[in-house]
Every structure is written in structure tokens, then in C-alpha cells.
Amino acid sequence: MYRIKDEWGEFLVRLARRAVEEYVRHKRVIEPPEDTPTELWEKMGVFVTLNRHNVPPQMALRGCIGFPLPIYPLVEATIKAAIYAAVDDPRFPPVQPEELDELTVEVSVLTPPELVEGPPEGRPKKIKVGRDGLLIEKGIYSGLLLPQVPVEWGWDEEEFLAQTCWKAGLPPDCWLDPDTKVYRFTAEIFEEEYPRGPVRRKPLV
């Protein structure tokens, strides 16, 4: 059962696109539209991903920022995440206006992270590639990978755990440490088929 209707997903992708374009072109932060569905004012976690169109998935990423926890209303979080993905992802220079025609927008609406319980060696059996995203925390370090990432890269569950450790700045086997907390979550993902094109729900498998 989907939490986010297809029309809401399209609304969020269009909103994220407009937020990016207005900020990149005019340094203007848009306001939530008056016709925002009531349900999208609920607090939810969300990530916005910008991808280069017609580029292999492993090379397509142009920016990805979001909020793992439901701390903002979804409509506001989507605007913030979209702008941050365009100009504040430390892995990339800010998006330039001439790039906008070549980028697709993807919005992932997250469920709250759930702690993976039990002994560390059993963690791979308690997550599933194609369903779960991961958040790993140890001390001051944390890292998150969305559910679509291991699918695009062809990882199994152990590699997914190792790569999330690496994303957190930790050794790849840190998921075997009892002091490392591993959380799983799911996401409903909506994407443009091509820049400014139709929006579809993205299947993971």
C-alpha cells in the first residue's frame, strides 16, 4: 500500500524542479504552492537527487541531499533538499543554469529509520536490496545510502552494508562492530523520465 499517491509524487518532483531552477537562475527560494495537498504538509524524510540524463547510472549523479528524519513538512523539506542538492552537495560544484536542460529530478520520500536489532553478523539477513535503504551511525560518524543505490550498482546485502560504512567515513567492515548502529528504511521514489518530462514511480526491481 503506497503512502504517496502518484499525483502527489508528480507534484513533489515538479516542485523540486521549480525550486532548483528558481534558485540556480535567480537565487530565489520558492514558497510552498497554495494548492499543496494537505497530506504533503505532514512531516516526512525526503531526499532530492539530480542526475545527468542519458548517462550510465554509476556516472549520472550530479547532486543528492535530503533529510533522513521527519523534521520538516514534506513540501518544505522537498524545496530545501532540492536547493541543497543543486548548490550545496560537497562532492560537486554548484549546478549552473546551462546544465538545467540536461538534468533529471528524482524525489525519494522516506519512512522513519528502523534500528536493525540482533547480533552484527546477522545484519545482512535483516536487510534486503531492492527494498531497504541504510543509515549507519558510530560515534560522530554517519552515512546514508538510498534504496536505489545498491540496485544501480549491483551490490548484495554485505556490499551494501560495507559501502554505507564507507559513506560514513568508517572502515567497510564497521557494520560487524556491535557499537555501530544500522538502521533500515524504505522509500517511494518518483523521477522525471527525461528533463522536464513525464514523472513516473521508479521501480527498484
Swiss-Prot record:
Signal peptide: none annotated. PROSITE patterns: AMMECR1 (PS51112). Residues 7-201 form the AMMECR1 domain. InterPro entries: AMMECR1, AMMECR1_dom_sf, AMMECR1_domain, AMMECR1_N, AmmeMemoSam_A, Uncharacterised_MJ0810. It comes from the Archaea. NCBIfam families: AmmeMemoSam_A, PRK00801.1, TIGR00296 family protein. This is Protein TK0174. It comes from Thermococcus kodakarensis (strain ATCC BAA-918 / JCM 12380 / KOD1) (Pyrococcus kodakaraensis (strain KOD1)). The lineage of its organism: Archaea, Methanobacteriati, Methanobacteriota, Thermococci, Thermococcales.
